[in-house]
């Protein structure tokens, strides 16, 4: 079973919208690669309360850590216009991960 990392824009979306999109992406990824996938949980609902200068960078760092576990990375939605998604794409591409995109 392949491990799937989902990269998607989240700004301005509700939890329900994000989770619905993630499920749709999981289904598309399974159809594309022809096998079940295990989704790496990269949707964070908490923030540890640490003092930092940039919360988005903190989240991006956590995402890149999880990206290291992926066999396949799926870029969904309008990812090209999301700064964090573009950085995740660059990392996945530079390190030779299998990339699927909408």
Outline where the language-model segments fall.
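Conserved catalytic or regulatory cores that recognize and/or transform ribose-phosphate-containing ligands
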Residues: 1-102
């Amino acid at each position: 079973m392949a491990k799937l990392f989902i990269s998607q824009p989240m700004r301005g979306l509700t939890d329900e919208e994000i989770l619905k999109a993630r499920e749709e992406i999981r289904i598309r990824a399974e159809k594309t690669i022809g096998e079940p996938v295990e989704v790496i949980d990269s949707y964070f609902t908490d923030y540890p309360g640490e003092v930092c200068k940039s919360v988005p960078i903190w989240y991006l760092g956590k995402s890149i850590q999880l990206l290291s576990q992926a066999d396949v990375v799926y870029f969904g939605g309008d990812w090209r216009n999301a700064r964090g998604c573009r950085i995740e794409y660059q990392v996945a591409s530079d390190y030779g991960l299998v990339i699927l995109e909408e």
